[in-house]
Amino acid sequence: MAGGREIKTKIKSVQNTRKVTRALEMVSASKIRKAQERMKTSRPYAQAMKQVIGHLAQASTDFQHPFLIEREQVKRVGYIVISSDRGLAGGLNNNLFRKMLGEVRPWQGTGAEIDVVTIGQKASAFFRRIKVNMVGSVTHLGDSPQVEQLIGVIKVMIDAFIEGKVDRVYLVYNRFVNTMTQKASFDQLLPLPAAEHKVAHHDWDYLYEPDAASVLEHVMTRYIESLVYQAVLENVASEHAARMVAMKAASDNANKMIGTLQLVYNKARQAAITQEISEIVSGAAAV
């Protein structure tokens, strides 16, 4: 059994660690509220853009945007993968990467090549490590990411799709469900799924200048950017929620460990005192 001094040192070390995990838990709890507000604020814009895209796509009968055309053969698949920049978020990032690799294997089985654009330090490090073809990367977006920070990497994948270098593009991120649940999501980004640009009726009364096709050409890119931006906000909220839960679990485990060590320390101290008393009694009897 370890000595009393070693046990007290261990208790002190665990207590210091608990202070850190509690602080991180409180910081994440504060940040998650702001992240949820930003996420909810951006949703109406994304939904309005989706509706406009549907109207424009059906209004333009003589023009079909490349983003709406499904290609017969898929030779190369692109992924925009969103992760956090920092760790200490439980299995948030690793679970996403593991599920993505599961999604990629069927494509590789057909002979399709894979291109990846990463958003976030953890995704960048992971795909470099496993030697996947990375064609773009952006990191350190912070807790309040802006669309302008994402335009460059989004353009890389959009241009590749328009030029025919990539035949399909997926958006991979953690969707925020609630504080306790974050779901790994794989959304087809390009070409836009039929449900994204088809509506059930034609009773809108929009007037397009100069025409629906010209407007569609400009709006499509903005729509793709809004989808990626919304996914980034979802991932930020998921990150803070996962970190808050992970740090709470760490604090709880620290409390249990401190209790166990305190019990061991008390037993060691009791044994030492009992031994001293026995030695004194034995010495007195000898006299």
UniProtKB/Swiss-Prot annotation:
It comes from the Bacteria. Its main location: membrane. One of its GO terms (cellular component) is plasma membrane. CDD domains: F1-ATPase_gamma (cd12151). Keywords: ATP synthesis, Cell inner membrane, Cell membrane, CF(1), Hydrogen ion transport, Ion transport, Membrane, Transport. Pfam families: ATP-synt. It is found in: Cell inner membrane. InterPro entries: ATP_synth_F1_ATPase_gsu (IPR035968), ATP_synth_F1_gsu (IPR000131), ATP_synth_F1_gsu_CS (IPR023632). One of its GO terms (biological process) is proton motive force-driven plasma membrane ATP synthesis. It is a peripheral membrane protein. Produces ATP from ADP in the presence of a proton gradient across the membrane. The gamma chain is believed to be important in regulating ATPase activity and the flow of protons through the CF(0) complex. Belongs to the ATPase gamma chain family. PANTHER family: ATP SYNTHASE GAMMA CHAIN (PTHR11693), ATP SYNTHASE SUBUNIT GAMMA, MITOCHONDRIAL (PTHR11693:SF22). This is ATP synthase gamma chain. It comes from Xanthomonas oryzae pv. oryzae (strain KACC10331 / KXO85).
